Amino acid sequence: MNAAPSRPDSSRGAPKSPLREHVAQSVRRYLRDLDGSDADDVYEIVLREMEIPLFVEVLNHCEGNQSRAAAMLGIHRATLRKKLKEYGLT
């Protein structure tokens, strides 16, 4: 498989990857929009909001082939199927 080239870690002063920067901006916006409200499940919210479009887009790219999508994601096919069911994407 042709994986995207890895980028250096931004903690060493190298530029951030575009995806990482988009995620950071979205998280900052979400936290700002909380406007002082308490949220004790931010990790779960962010994970869900990232995984759903990730799975949808990778499955579309793989023309619905779950085995190929799981391989592309680097997870076991059973894990992908479990997540798809959990998110109501089956």
Curated annotation (Swiss-Prot):
Stored InterPro entries: Fis_DNA-bd (IPR005412), Homeodomain-like_sf (IPR009057), HTH_Fis (IPR002197), Trans_regulatory_Fis (IPR050207)
Coiled-coil segments: none
MF annotations from Gene Ontology: sequence-specific DNA binding
Keyword DNA-binding on entry: yes
Protein name: Putative Fis-like DNA-binding protein
Region entry Disordered, spans: 1-22
The organism's taxonomic lineage, starting at the top: Bacteria, Pseudomonadati, Pseudomonadota, Gammaproteobacteria, Lysobacterales
Organism: Xanthomonas campestris pv. campestris (strain ATCC 33913 / DSM 3586 / NCPPB 528 / LMG 568 / P 25)
Family indicated by similarity: Belongs to the transcriptional regulatory Fis family.
Keywords, sorted A to Z: DNA-binding
UniProt-listed Gene3D superfamilies: Homeodomain-like
